[in-house]
Amino acid sequence: MPCTTILVGKNASYDGSTLVARNEDSSNGVFEPKRMRVVHPDEQPRVYASVLSHLTVELPDNPMRYTSVPDVIPGHGIWAEAGFNELNVGMSATETLTTNERVRGADPLVDYVPAKGNEGEDGYVPAQTGGLGEEDMVTLVLPYAKSARDGVRILGDLLERYGTYENNGIAFSDVDEIWWLETIGGHHWIAKRVPDDAYVTMPNQLGIDSFDLDDAEGAQVDHMCSADLRSWMAEWHLDLTLGVEGDGPAAVFNPREAFGSHSDSDHVYNTPRAWYMQRCLNPSDVWDGPDADYTPESDDIPWSRVPERKVTIEDIKYVLSSHYQGTEYDCYGSKGTPATRGAYRPIGINRNGQLAVLQLRPYAQPAYRAVQWMAFGSNSFNALVPLYANVETMPEYYADTQTRVTSENFYWANRLIGALADVRFHECGRAVEDYQEKVGGMGHKQIHDVDAAVAALPEAEAPAELARANEAFAQLVRVETDALLGKVLYTTSCAMKNSFAMNDNVR
């Protein structure tokens, strides 16, 4: 999926949490309805069948309960996207990545190839099963992962066995660590631990820019990889490090150069997003003019950086909702020219489907440690709401999305708000910002109050109480969301082209 990701290490976050956040964006012209779901062990398949690749995978018989954000429309797979399991392990999958021709030749993607002809007849060629993809990964890994590292190991084993038909980045988190895995070609992969004091920005482009092969093959303190990565790189001459003696890759090399891309489309679609996110979190750097440290089209924007101050939930929401505010590239702005205002792909885009922020709080007890912040629709116009993840059910307002457009659930209400407010962006802006600030404030208070209420309960009673708290908060969110919908509908209705000032009846 054409998504955007930010990862925040525990010492870089405002409260010591590990934070994993990703927009799930549909393809251009597609708007995929989303909902929330809790998957119980008896609902998890023991034999998984992929819709897109026709792959069948036998799964262990001991899955855990987990949260997910699946597609609503049936027929093309689950696409569970993001969630927590019972052990407070988080997973977000996937961020579609880029690669290059050398990698594609060295380890081709494992595409599904339909059968040719009719079985039993001359010339019949059976279908070729494809590999894993975004459709599958959360369902295949999250119910079984005991830690972030374990999630990397499980997915790595699956990739080496079955391969993949697309280039993807996947995040795993627990209360101590965040790991980022990038697939390389059809069967290879690398994974790197996010530094505790840093954040990571990921547009749809292979991102890791330094990798220690010795660590990955040894202690695995900060790096992991597929078993034959070194020999495979040597055979295909993939490392581009200058001055390396012998045939093998450098012990520390740049994966972005070896496996990634620097295409013209990257400079329109990908690098500007990393540039703007880091501009927000490290504002003292020089971002504009001839002396800029980095420009929107720079190929060397760092994968990870230490922020100038600790990063909050609101910072994450802002950068993942952004459309280059304050620059000549803002599609809603007045700076620059019409050409500059449409030059780069926004992060907050019309086809944002959902945003999941996975927060694991070290100061909270395991029974209520995991909070999954959620937003639906275009991020420029929506608000994040917190949900405790250790629950048996999700509130109907978030879970009962249907294909029918209605204001009765959170997904469609936000889609309607975005479509209406976009038309009169500046006139609706104050109401949208008030809504976002109010709902965000309500969310932080909700967490504080519920934490205190649940702290004294036996651990076994926590899920039911957390579910009640989620439901009560969903009803408050519904009231505020309905009110915003009414405001933007009124504002946009008043500005319709067929309006006329003369009346014949005044109430």
Label the predicted regions.
Residues P2-E134, I154-D293:
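A contiguous strand-loop segment
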Residues A21-K34, T96, L181-T183, V319-D330, ...:
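Soluble extracytoplasmic regions of secretory-pathway and membrane proteins
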Residues P60-Y66, V152, S334-G342:
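Short Pro/Gly-enriched beta-strand edge/turn motifs at strand-loop
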Residues V138-Y144:
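Short, well-ordered beta-strand elements within core beta-sheets of diverse protein domains
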Residues Y144-D150:
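Short, charged, surface-exposed loops that flank catalytic or proteolytic processing sites
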Residues S231-Y368:
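Glycine-rich, aromatic-lined ligand/substrate-binding cores of catalytic
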Residues Y324-Q325, Y329-A456:
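Substrate-recognition/cap regions that form aromatic- and gly/pro-loop-enriched pockets
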Residues Q436-R507:
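Histidine-centered catalytic/metal-binding microenvironments
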